[in-house]
């Protein structure tokens, strides 16, 4: 007992200092949690708070259990043999184990659950048997003291025989009680067990002693057990309501827990959870011949699983260790949450510090249901639910074991992870993903860098590609923007460099190709950031910067080279780089590089790399071009897809707003959005052209401090702009698609598509600049009816990302744009003619302004047919897509040979006819033109016409308007002051365009007939022409008389002649001077 008193204070009861005045066999106990002193009789297992005055009287009557029917007489013989055991031994096994259930400390359930039966049994046996006082204090795994007893072999054998007999169904109460006591001796840590058995344990011994607590039970036992027996649930003494699969090895018969016993225990666990008392009865072998099959499987050894002798015979495993194993196993198994909850409930419900005799029976067993439900209770009493508790339906107490539906396949954690993150793989022997950084086995220094960067776990693309890449296998990874692809290949590169140990001065070991300078420098920054601890060197090669510094860095040596294909190919041709050490090749944004036309350079570079390399290809889309180059460059690759590959998907973390905005309202709406953002929020505005970027920078930048980046900026300017934007000094970045891919800047809140891009893929990449690395973002897109052909794909992207689709966009998609989509005429490549509108109308007549759809002169974005203003120019040019007054190459319109009809930067004439169609343009100045479609060849072009914006004068703003064209000076079509057409002899495009764009502008000059003049020169234009036109065999010269006195009918006739004339002029450059003179004279007469 001294050993027990020296035990540290814990939540469980402990012996009080020995008091010689206490009558025997009473002992003083102290509740470890409350410190309350109470008294316990080991023989009767009675506890009370009043100090006992005399030993309690012993009942001389034996329990009358003859009324309990027994299934066989053979078991009774074994029970009679068990009667010969000393009663002291029975008490020794059950004395102190039963007492904790009556203490106030019994309400502290965790200590009871964690305390092994072997801890408490010696405490009682130490009082009664001197040979068992050799106890060893063993620190319990859960922090509670545990007592390990080493018993003599004789007593172990005796206990073993008792256990063997206690397995069999009992006829007599003392046998029943002995079996119960002995079994409970190994489950003292189960509190509810104690609550029940404290009243039933001293039911009787070999001498037929019966104590008051047993008398309480006898009044109920015959009726209850009889009822249960007739139901096939004979439970005269019951195994604990515990699935055997949840027991520790110490509770098994041979302690080894072999496969057969595990299977049997699993069946028993299922039966106990689903069948309740029937399963318990089966375990106790108290069955009729037709009882549970589980009893037949377990045989007579089931109760012996708790045999103390068998437990201690396995000296290499201590009892407390076995109990710890069980507890851990119990808590770790599924389906035990209901038991845990019940274990938490029991102490609370039994926490009243009442005298055991004064406590109601239902309170003493803690209400009944948890007693039976708790699998850790050990033996729960004679009845399944406790001797003093009402009968409960078992399903209300124990949660049935979870059984998956046969329809649903069992998924492993890896499959669940892949399904949750939409990870699909194609290949053989694909390893499981690294769900956490710790499971990846990465070097500590790399893990520190990743954790310090704030990454909680690998992204799906990283988790799946890392283990594959570390196997030196080729990979094709397809994932959307912002998915963490950069670290997906950098981390394997770091691991490779740790093993290779190559001399970087002989050439790089890792080569990474990227499409743009911005992405290349960004990859370099990430490599230096996460490879700092690994002492990795990295250099970046890109165009737009001097080669000298880059070559010097290569000479110093670099483990990793990040390059754009163009600059790397240049350096390779200079033979300033050696690829013989390259072991890892990475193609980042491979689809973008192919779109930019880098495939020849890529193939040339790859041919210089040894074939033993490992190749990783990361792409956002999977078109056939990418598939082809992947099949050529990769060997047996593993394909890893994040999301669906067959459709373009946007990041669902981005809220997308698509607004149908007229061109003239875009700038005003842009300013509204910028003003609505929080101060300091980073915004990217994407435009389709450099010119528009500069224009917006001038108009918007004054108020919002915007910076611009596009292809015309030098590398120094680009770096400065990006640094300004990253640092927050400039919160608005205006960019072309050069920044649509690979640009990774934190805290970008808003992306605005001022122009819709040339494809939905670019749209997805544009908006992907926000919502990166798990953040959220907002994207605004200005959509016009001219973008109608992208509407169906845009709707798919919006619906795929669960975004709202505006009704206007649906209408545009249904009608094909422009108010009658099928009416759009197309050019030779199937593209929509820019100046044709559907439904037979013309683009020049279709909208506000001077016929323009969005104001201006029917340009896509205002101006005179221009996309962004100007006279037909896409951005502020006179018909030019890129130049100010013309096409990309500063020409007017998109005429026959791609728009060099009326070239020159400052011309007063322009191609108002546009790409084609019979477009009309008119204002009340002097314009009337009719385009005759695209025409054929240079002479006729894509819409002919000329615009003279001056009232009554044929003066061109530039005297050398058409000097780049025809150099022949045989005649002058017009005596304009500028002489702009004096050198055009061929009449190819100059004349044809002039014919196409003039039919209206003479109406404002006194209501005369329509004049087809191109100029309103104050002097007669053709009177000085004495030279007759050259006559050829195929020229048809129109009669001069029909056009001299021109009226409306004659004008119509002339229009019918013009196509033939034009086609002829295209062939030989004939000039119909008479027709031109007739066209000019009515205008000349009007001059003052």
UniProtKB/Swiss-Prot annotation:
Keywords associated with the record: Acetylation, ATP-binding, Helicase, Hydrolase, Nonsense-mediated mRNA decay, Nucleotide-binding, Nucleus, Ribosome biogenesis, RNA-binding, rRNA processing
Domain notes: The Q motif is unique to and characteristic of the DEAD box family of RNA helicases and controls ATP binding and hydrolysis.
Molecular functions (GO terms): ATP binding; ATP hydrolysis activity; RNA binding; RNA helicase activity
Ranges spanned by the short sequence motif Q motif, renumbered to the chain: 435-463
CDD domains noted in UniProt: SF2_C_DEAD (cd18787), WW (cd00201)
Domain (Helicase C-terminal) ranges: 669-813
Name of this protein: DEAD-box ATP-dependent RNA helicase 40
Record-linked Pfam families: DEAD, Helicase_C, WW
Basic and acidic residues bias spans: 222-231, 945-963
Biased composition (Low complexity): 87-137, 148-171, 200-215, 969-983
N-acetylalanine modification, residue list: 2
Compositional bias of kind Polar residues: 236-254
Record-listed ATP binding positions: 479-486
Family: Belongs to the DEAD box helicase family. DDX5/DBP2 subfamily.
Biased composition (Basic residues): 984-1013
Record-listed E.C. numbers: 3.6.4.13
Annotated region (Disordered), positions in chain: 1-28, 47-178, 192-254, 861-1033
PROSITE patterns: DEAD_ATP_HELICASE, HELICASE_ATP_BIND_1, HELICASE_CTER, Q_MOTIF, WW_DOMAIN_1, WW_DOMAIN_2
